[in-house]
Amino acid sequence: MEETEKKVATQEGRFFSKMKVFLMSLTCAYLAKSLSGVYMNSMLTQIERQFGIPTSVVGFITGSFEIGNLLLIVFVSYFGRKLHRPIIIGVGCVVMGLGCFLMASPHFLMGRYKYETTISPTSNLSSNSFLCIENRTQTLKPTQDPTECVKEIKSLMWIYVLIGNTMRGIGETPIMPLGISYIEDFAKSENSPLYIGILEMGKIVGPIIGLLLGSFFARVYVDIGSVNTDDLTITPTDTRWVGAWWIGFLVCAGVNILTSIPFFFFPKTLPKKELQDNVDVTKYEKVEKHRERAKKENLGITKDFLPFMKSLCCNPIYMLFSLTSVLQINGFASTFTFLPKYLEQQYGKSTSEAVFLIGVYSLPPVCLGYLISGFIMKKFKITVKKAAYIAFGLSLSEYFIFLCNYLLTCDNFPVAGLTTSYKGVQHPLYGEKNVLADCNTRCSCLTDTWDPVCGDNGLAYMSACLAGCEKSVGTGTNMVFQNCSCIGSSGNSSAVLGLCKKGPECDNKLQYFLIKSVFSSFIFSLAAIPGYMVLLRCVKSEEKSIGVGLHAFFIRLLAGIPAPVYFGALIDRTCLHWGTLKCGQPGACRMYDINRFRHIYLGLPAAVRGSSFLPAVFILILMRKFHFPGDIHSPDTELAEMKLTEKESECTDVCRSPKVENDGELKTKL
């Protein structure tokens, strides 16, 4: 008897050891994948400037991750549990690491980054061609030499980033469903929620680290170590600045590959914990039979795929909920993807500052909201109908808070000839042909080069030449231009490099915007779990696996992939001045019409999300006609539920993993 107890204790210790190591490994994988995804989103502006591509192409690169997910989601959902799950997870981590490395590779293939400028960074001679000189020919034109134009093909290197991001999507697909199903199958049932909660912590810590990395590397110049940064004439707030985006992807690649190593040493199966608590043979056989029935039911799902699909498509609540989710995610995905760009253009912040502010003000409220929401749902045993009303009310409240962003706006940067007249008067927006004025027509300036300077009159000019400056002193970012005829009639009017900063009133509005973001993020996270509860309860038990997978498929196909593309294309239409490549072709946008940008950035998500409340209202109406588990409390009902407990538990074991595998779909796009 004592030997048996010792044997059981030894087996139990081994089980705990293996399960704990697997849990720790899976948590690290969660952290690595969320770290990579959030870092990617934080570096979109840097990638846009590095390759000189429009925002619509950046949106396509973002959507390529969802494309990679779609390529394997069906295979993983229905056949992944038959294979060696830990090894598949390990391979997925390796693929993610290789994808991140591929995304960083263009930096080593393209050579040094050269931003458009007319200024010689080391010269302080007043005879430099970037100054106002009368009666000269324009020699500083975009290069039309065929050899130089061939070199510009390097801008197509963004395709490497596209393919790498697709690989990241492919590699991430098996981690969540197979990892959670492995825990659900071999961990003690009462410990599963704790283990899943630990995994969620990995998903929370990853984005925080990703945003901190993004904020740090956005401040580091892209060619750090290869150029003398003291000679640069741009700063991190300049729209031509490109941070060291590639270093972060190398970090992500290393982290993902390191996290893959433990998974190759785990067995295909572990002994079920319940069996070690009791060595009774009868119970062992009973559990084994139960497991066999679960496997048969799981295989039946694939055989009954078409009937289940037909049943789901004929389920009005399910289809309306999917429509609501698609509309909501269209708005959220677009807003979050281009939030750093909005903060840069609207409030004059650098990419580094914008990413840091997002991490500080958005993520902590989301984490707190998930914890409080989960506690309330469990503590008060909220029914599915009440959950639907709670989700609707909270979402509507968050929507009205979102609309308040229209009150927290700033004016365009004052740039002579683009947003104001040369006298500083706000005027209907100018075109490129209006950048010339009486004060600079004698200078023979280029009108398409973006090399902004800020005059001491508070007005910015597209270049020192267009400001009428005749002299310069200093080098690098400390260069000062003097005798600028467009700035003032006095001989000592001057200008410095860069756009003029926005006033303190704009900084105050940014603070209000961030405070509002705290409440908005918190309320949204409160609504996510009740909403997801509606999804799980509106379908039959045997349809939950396909139902959750199909719901995720709808979101990726109709929101995750197209939303960044069409949203980016609309943002491109608000550009006031495009950068210029060597062959004279347009590059990345240097300045936007912030008023039109704001209408697109805030108006389109407001319209899309506003329309989502219409199908949500129909869901509430339809739910009154149906009865869901927990809605009716009576002794007869409780007795009937007790008798059906064993039957329902079999279905639950089959469907439990798919319930959780897409738990993040409605929560956040971080």
UniProtKB/Swiss-Prot annotation:
Residues 41-59, 112-155, 225-242, 334-353, 406-513, 572-605 are extracellular. It catalyses: estrone 3-sulfate(out) + hydrogencarbonate(in) = estrone 3-sulfate(in) + hydrogencarbonate(out); taurocholate(out) + hydrogencarbonate(in) = taurocholate(in) + hydrogencarbonate(out); L-thyroxine(out) = L-thyroxine(in); prostaglandin E2(out) = prostaglandin E2(in). The chain crosses the membrane at residues 21-40, 60-80, 87-111, 156-184, 204-224, 243-267, 312-333, 354-377, 382-405, 514-536, 546-571, 606-623. It is found in: Basolateral cell membrane. GO terms for molecular function: organic anion transmembrane transporter activity. The keyword 4Fe-4S does not apply. One of its GO terms (biological process) is response to xenobiotic stimulus. Keywords: Cell membrane, Disulfide bond, Glycoprotein, Ion transport, Membrane, Phosphoprotein, Transmembrane, Transmembrane helix, Transport. The record marks 107 as: Essential for pH-sensitivity of estrone 3-sulfate transport. Residues 433-488 form the Kazal-like domain. GO terms for cellular component: basolateral plasma membrane; membrane; plasma membrane. Residues 1-20, 81-86, 185-203, 268-311, 378-381, 537-545, 624-670 are cytoplasmic. The modification Phosphoserine is found at residue 634. Disulfide bonds join 439-469, 445-465, 454-486. InterPro entries: Kazal_dom, Kazal_dom_sf, MFS_dom, MFS_trans_sf, OATP. Belongs to the organo anion transporter (TC 2.A.60) family. Mediates the Na(+)-independent transport of organic anions such as steroid sulfate conjugates (dehydroepiandrosterone sulfate (DHEAS), 17-beta-glucuronosyl estradiol, estrone-3-sulfate), conjugated (taurocholate) and unconjugated (cholate) bile acids, prostaglandin E2 (PGE2) and L-thyroxine T4. Also capable of transporting sulfobromophthalein (BSP), ouabain and gadoxetate. Hydrogencarbonate/HCO3(-) acts as the probable counteranion that exchanges for organic anions. This is Solute carrier organic anion transporter family member 1A1. It comes from Mus musculus (Mouse).
